[in-house]
Structure formats: structure tokens, C-alpha cells
């Protein structure tokens, strides 16, 4: 998985407010179990990748895992003890904007107990609250 997009129209964007519920990406497509977010927040590449590794560790390579989020938004940050002004700061991190209801991961597996344990361990790696959804 790539940790940032290849090209963007602009290198830096405004942060914007993250409020409301998701009206897209809130249903299962390929899998029969999913990990759904229930609060707002940001997920960076390291969090997504560590959760993916935990899913692979518990589920094995036989079950199909689909990642539905990608870090496509840039966050900037000015260095410590720098006065205000003189432009926007350098790129600090790439994040994915998460709203309540977005499906983060999908799994195609038929044993609910194994999937439940794998999703629990994967959700511990994320900075937002999640729940398991199924068909």
C-alpha cells in the first residue's frame, strides 16, 4: 500500500472541519464482515498499516482483506518556537479523513469468532472508536 498519493493539484490544502456522518463508503462491497468507524477523526498511514498487519496475522493469507481508506489529505505544521506568519508550514503528515459510518476494512471470511478477534486487535491500533458490521 502506498503511503501518499502520487500527484495532487496543490501541494497543501486547508484543514477544514470534520463533522457530520458519512453518506458514501458506508456499506459492504466485497466482504461479509467490516470494521466501521463510529466517531470523527484522522487516520495516518502508520495506523492503517499496523491494523492491516494485525488482520493478516490473525486471519492468514487465505481470507481476502480489502482496505477502504487511503491517506490522501496533507497536514502541515510549523516548527516549535516559530513566530506566526511567513506562510504555511511544511508537510507534517498524510491522513485519511474519517467520519462516522465509513467502512475501514472488509474481510471475506466465514468464521465470525476469528474475524471478531482480528477486528478487536486491529481496532486497538486505530485512534478512533469502531464497531463490527456484517451482512
Swiss-Prot record:
Keyword set, alphabetical order: Ribonucleoprotein, Ribosomal protein, RNA-binding, rRNA-binding, tRNA-binding
One GO BP: translation
CDD domains: Ribosomal_L16_L10e
Entry-linked InterPro entries: Ribosomal_uL16, Ribosomal_uL16_bact-type, Ribosomal_uL16_CS, Ribosomal_uL16_dom, Ribosomal_uL16_sf
GO molecular function: rRNA binding; structural constituent of ribosome; tRNA binding
GO CC term (a single one): ribonucleoprotein complex
Keyword Ribonucleoprotein (UniProt): yes
Region forming the signal peptide: none
Superkingdom: Bacteria
Its biological purpose: Binds 23S rRNA and is also seen to make contacts with the A and possibly P site tRNAs.
PANTHER family: 50S/60S RIBOSOMAL PROTEIN L16 (PTHR12220), LARGE RIBOSOMAL SUBUNIT PROTEIN UL16M (PTHR12220:SF13)
Similarity annotation: Belongs to the universal ribosomal protein uL16 family.
Subunit structure: Part of the 50S ribosomal subunit.
Protein's name in the database: Large ribosomal subunit protein uL16
Originating species: Carsonella ruddii (strain PV)
Amino acid at each position: 500500500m502506498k503511503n501518499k498519493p502520487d500527484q495532487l493539484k496543490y501541494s497543501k490544502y486547508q484543514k477544514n472541519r470534520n463533522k457530520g456522518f458519512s453518506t458514501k463508503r458506508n456499506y459492504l462491497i466485497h466482504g461479509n464482515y467490516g470494521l466501521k468507524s463510529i466517531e470523527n477523526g484522522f487516520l495516518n498511514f502508520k495506523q492503517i498499516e499496523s491494523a492491516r498487519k494485525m488482520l493478516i496475522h490473525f486471519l492468514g493469507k487465505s481470507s481476502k482483506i480489502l482496505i477502504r481508506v487511503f491517506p490522501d489529505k496533507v497536514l502541515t505544521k510549523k516548527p516549535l518556537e516559530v513566530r506566526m506568519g511567513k506562510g504555511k508550514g511544511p508537510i507534517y503528515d498524510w491522513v485519511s479523513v474519517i467520519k462516522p459510518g465509513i467502512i475501514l476494512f472488509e474481510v471475506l471470511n466465514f468464521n465470525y469468532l476469528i474475524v471478531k478477534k482480528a477486528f478487536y486487535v486491529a481496532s486497538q491500533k486505530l485512534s478512533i472508536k469502531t464497531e463490527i458490521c456484517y451482512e
